[in-house]
């Protein structure tokens, strides 16, 4: 497969942080580029809530020699004490697109995970001439009831951060972190599958180590937007697309992800066995192989532990 790379990125081989000025502020964006000629279109990685540009170390090791990576830390959708300045999905989509302008990337593939999926979806829907391939994991038309309830709880906690239920001390933060992880992951599956349990533990440790209330941070980052039309009407056409989910995912179920895939013309839908919502962490090698095969346009039938179907 012949693809057009980015000369600008090739001139910045290795791993670099860039400042992306956007509107009245700016945000950091990590690029990881192998040395050599610009032969592959970059992959724009849109992380889920509470992830950063440094959350993809394993993925980088698996794929950075194959294609350039662009991993923005998009601005939080909500700023503490400044609810009136909340950003919308359209704003975040514009911010992500702006990074490609600043880095002089004309065409790119998109990987959207969890709450990064609504941004990736909108990019493909509105810019099919620029998005070469679309991959979404952990996608849902609307948040599951438990997650919606937890987001509402976070909004109430944010409204009065000095309330008795605010996670002010380390024990409170740990309790809030456990509550969040228990909703975002399948705790029953974690008891049977060590890789799922280990991924949940990594996220829990990261949340508990933060000085912020994990639930309020999740709401600010993008969580509250999940209550506001994450899946826009109109569908996606003209962009080769893949939607994937772990079979044990209870945050965005197999049915949820299939419903999103059904809005994308000709999408490939994959269910990865022995995986949960954090499948890119739990099954990092298999996840990277899947992404590389799809980006290269190679058959996915060689993948083990996956079921594959094609949407009409």
Q: PLM features: residue spans?
A:
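Alpha/beta-hydrolase fold catalytic core
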Residues: 1-43, 65-67, 292-312
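Conserved HGGG/HGGXW glycine-rich cap/lid loop of the alpha/beta-hydrolase fold
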Residues: 27-81
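Active-site loop/oxyanion-hole signature of alpha/beta-hydrolase fold enzymes
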Residues: 70-111, 115, 289
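Hydrolases whose catalytic domains are alpha/beta-hydrolase-1, hotdog thioesterase
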Residues: 119-123
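Flexible "cap/lid" loop of the alpha/beta hydrolase fold
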Residues: 125, 132-168
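Conserved alpha/beta-hydrolase catalytic His-Asp/Glu region
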Residues: 146, 167-235
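Conserved serine/cysteine hydrolase catalytic core
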Residues: 209-262, 271
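Catalytic histidine-centered segment of alpha/beta-hydrolase-like enzymes
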Residues: 269, 275-288
